[in-house]
Amino acid sequence: MRVNITLACTECGERNYITKKNKRNNPDRVEFKKYCSRDKKQTVHRETK
């Protein structure tokens, strides 16, 4: 079961990315290191509601 999720920057809080995840394989909130255009560097982006 794939669902759409939004990834938000942990430093500035801006929601930068929309992606999909499989809830069966990843039931917890996912974290990725992605580029934040507001901070102009790579930061940890966490799944939000």
Curated annotation (Swiss-Prot):
Keywords annotated in UniProt: Ribonucleoprotein, Ribosomal protein
A molecular function (GO) term: structural constituent of ribosome
Domain of life: Bacteria
GO biological processes: translation
GO cellular component, as recorded: cytoplasm; ribonucleoprotein complex; ribosome
TM regions (residue ranges): none
Pfam families (UniProt xref): Ribosomal_L33
Alphabetical list of PROSITE patterns matching this protein: RIBOSOMAL_L33
InterPro entries, per the entry: Ribosomal_bL33, Ribosomal_bL33_CS, Ribosomal_bL33_sf, Ribosomal_zn-bd
NCBIfam families: PRK00504.1, PRK00595.1, rpmG_bact
PANTHER family: 50S RIBOSOMAL PROTEIN L33, CHLOROPLASTIC (PTHR43168), LARGE RIBOSOMAL SUBUNIT PROTEIN BL33C (PTHR43168:SF2)
Protein family membership: Belongs to the bacterial ribosomal protein bL33 family.
Name of protein: Large ribosomal subunit protein bL33B
Species classification: Bacteria, Bacillati, Bacillota, Bacilli, Bacillales
Gene that encodes the chain: rpmG2
